[in-house]
Structures are given as C-alpha cells and as structure tokens.
Amino acid sequence: MFNIILAMVCALIGLIIGYVAISMKMKSSKEAAELTLLNAEQDAVDLRGKAEIEAEHIRKAAERESKAHQKELLLEAKEEARKYREEIEKEFKSDRQELKQMEARLTDRASSLDRKDENLSNKEKMLDSKEQSLTDKSRHINEREQEIATLETKKVEELSRIAELSQEEAKDIILADTEKDLAHDIATRIKEAEREVKDRSNKIAKDLLAQAMQRLAGEYVTEQTITTVHLPDDNMKGRIIGREGRNIRTLESLTGIDVIIDDTPEVVVLSGFDPIRREIARMTLESLIQDGRIHPARIEELVEKNRLEMDQRIREYGEAAAYEIGAPNLHPDLIKIMGRLQFRTSYGQNVLRHSVEVGKLAGILAGELGENVDLARRAGFLHDMGKAIDREVEGSHVEIGMEFARKYKEHPIVVNTIASHHGDVEPDSVIAVIVAAADALSSARPGARNESMENYIKRLRDLEEIANGFEGVQNAFALQAGREIRIMVQPGKVSDDQVVIMSHKVREKIEQNLDYPGNIKVTVIREMRAVDFAK
C-alpha cells in the first residue's frame, strides 16, 4: 500500500512539472517565463512537501493497520493451536486409560491362571501323598497282623505246656496279655475303622440331626437352653470360627457351651443346659465382638475375666433377692449361694424366683396363722439353696442345704424346714409345714414347671457324670442338646492310645446306663501345653 501511495505522489509531481514546462513555453518573455518557472518551482516544492507529509501519514497509518492485522492473525493462530493441542491431549488420555484397563485385565487373567496352576499342583501332590500313605498303612497293617498271629501262636503253645492251668484261666491270661501288648494296635484299628466309615456317615448324621431337631422342638426348650447374640455383620461369623475352627473350638471347650453358626443373618446362637456357662459364653462373645481381637489367647483371657464378673453378678442377684424377701442380714456366702439360683432351673422354673415366691407365700400364710412372719420368709427363701451347688457337692439338695444352714448358724427352724420340705424328715414346727405348702403352691401352679425340661437337663447331667467317672478326665461337657459329650483329659495321665480306648468305654457305659433317642457322639480330647516366661 505504501508503494501505491508513493507512486501516486510521484505521478502528481510529474504532472505538476509537466504543467510548469508547458506554461513556460507559452510565455513569451524570458522574465515572465522565469517568474512563472520560479513560482512553479516554489509551488512544486510546496506540493512536494505536502505530498511527502501526507505520504508519511499514510505510511504510518498503513503500518499501524498492518501491525493490528498481524496481531489479530497471531491470536487466531494461537487459539487454533490451543484447541488442537487440547483435542490431541484428550485423545491421548483416552488411549492411555484404555491401555491401562487392558493391562489390568491381562494382569488379572495371568494371576487367575497362576492360581489355577498352583491349585492343580497342590492337588496332585496331595493325591500322591495320600496314595503313599495308604500304601504304607496297608503294609504296616499286614506286618502287624503277622506279628499278632505269631504272638498268639507262641502264647497258646506256652500256656498249653502248663498242665495245672485250666482252659478258662489260660484264656484269661491270653486276653489280658494281648490287650496290654496290643493297646496301640487296637487304637490304630479303631481309627482305621472310623476313617473307613466317615465318608458314608454324612447322610446318616444329617438324618439323626433332623430327628433330634424334630423331637426337641418346643418353646420351653428354646427359652431355657439357648441365648442369641447379634452380630454387626455376617463377616464377623468367619472371625468367630477362626482359622480351621480354632476360635470356636476354644470358646466351646472353655465354656462347655455349643456355639451354633448357621445361615441366619447376623446371629450366633449359644446352646447349653447350664445357664451360668451360657451367660459366660454370651458375655465373652459380646466382648470379643466389641474388642475386635478374636484369637484363642484372647478368648481364654475374656472367659476368665467374665467368670470373675459373673461371680459379682451372682452376688448382686443374691443381695437383690434377699432385700426383696426382707432378709438383709444373711451371711455373705449364703447370699452368693442364693445368687447362683438365678442361673438354675427346676422343671423349667427359675429357682431363685421360686425361692422368693415361696418366701413371700410363707410370710403371708404365717401372718394369717399368727406365726413369725420374718422367720417364715427366711425359711421359705432358703429352702432350696442346696440346688445351687448340688452339681459340685455330693448329696441331695436337701442334705447340702441342711449342711450349709448349720454351717452358717441359721435358726434350727430354718434347718428343719430345709430338711422336711420334701418329706425326708418330720417337720418340727408350723413354719416348716407352711413352707412345704408354699413350695407346693409355687411349683404346682399351671405353667410354673415343665417335666420335659427337667428330664432333658437330667440326661445331660448324667452324661457328664458318666464321663467324669473315668480316671484322668479333667472336664466333661454335654453339647448339641445331649447329642455329644466332649471330654478333656489330663495329658500326663492319659496317653494318645488310651484316648481312643476311653472313648469306646464311655460309649459302652452310656449305652448301658442311659435311655436316649438317636445317637450320642463321644469326643475325647488330649491337649499338651508348654508355657514359659521370658524375663
């Protein structure tokens, strides 16, 4: 544009010069021509200066316009470049995300294939190991059978040479020596037989369990023998069971309570006929859930802690009942004994509430007959206290109650009332007769007691007594509503081989002495522990 303007200025100057030249020719005189030329030159100079100034203005305006246009073009180019860069980055980001997803899928697939390969390898090793084990056991059994046959032949030949022994005496000696020498072999054979029928016993066990559930269905059993513990979520069930069931076995062994974990959401059921054990198990389980640390050592710690806490609660129950009946001056040991009755039932009736009820009834009857109301209340309240400890001390609850009443210097009328309330001895006072009548009123009213519950609890107690009668037994617990007796033995007194023999002897004694529906599983557990402290 600047060149165009410059050309126009030059053309204009040319025209002016031409005009001056023509004008000069037309002048006739030299002076006129010179004057005209001078004027024309001056005008041309003026016009040229103006043209140059105008051209400079036009050039600067053109430069400004050109710079503005260049800036606009530069901004447009930058904007297009930015948009293009954003589109490219978006495409790259999408491609990177897709590549990451593909990489994750490939990694998962590779991990899955590795796990499957490892599982197949483990199964193959396990099968090889089992095959080798079966081969070794078969060879060992054959060798033992040959040894037994040889030994029996030698025994028979040796005894046959002894003329003074009769056939029966020789038979007894053979049997005694054989049983002593082959105790390990007997235990091994029993274990082998149990393993052989284990695979076929699943269906039979399920049928027996269904029969037991049908025969024991009833509200009074559910209300008296189970406790429900609610869980925060179903994941807690796996933690309660523990690795290979160690946690749940520890809890059952320490409390003697059956822990039932089924498909019921967020619920664990504690089943057992002893309410004290069941309450300790409930407290322990709730503490474990709240604490979050669930392992055998923690379970043992909490069970011991809750046993101490249960002792305190028992004392509080006894104090509350004594205050309710109006006998606040009872000996502290008697208060604790009475508190234990909160966790004892008789034919389904709570014995502590029954004792309070008998005391109140006896007080009312004594008031009507003009007898000592406070003494009648006290005698009625204490008449069944022997039931609190009849499981730990030999003798009937009447005999135990009399012994403790004398020990803690109770009134002779109270002692006679305890002795006579079941008709074992003659009553010596009107109060003894009143308490016997109150006892009959409390226990005989409709709905107060349930015969089936008492028979059920008696069967469980008899199971435990049979097991505890064997030498070396440390603890015995009846579980699974009487379908299992679990026996803990002292490892120093009972060997591994004797454990198997003991289980069969317990089974035989149960079959001889008890009547029961279905089957009862006998489990004998021998556990050796070594504890030391680093100082």
From Swiss-Prot:
Any one GO cellular component localisation term in the record: plasma membrane
Transmembrane regions: 4-24
One MF term in the entry's GO annotations: RNA endonuclease activity
Protein task: Endoribonuclease that initiates mRNA decay.
Listed name of the protein: Ribonuclease Y
Bilayer topology annotation: Single-pass membrane protein
HAMAP family with a match to the protein in the record: RNase_Y
Subcellular location: Cell membrane
Limits of the HD domain: 351-444
The KH domain, residue ranges: 225-285
Superkingdom of the organism of origin: Bacteria
Gene name tied to this protein: rny
Enzyme Commission (EC) number: 3.1.-.-
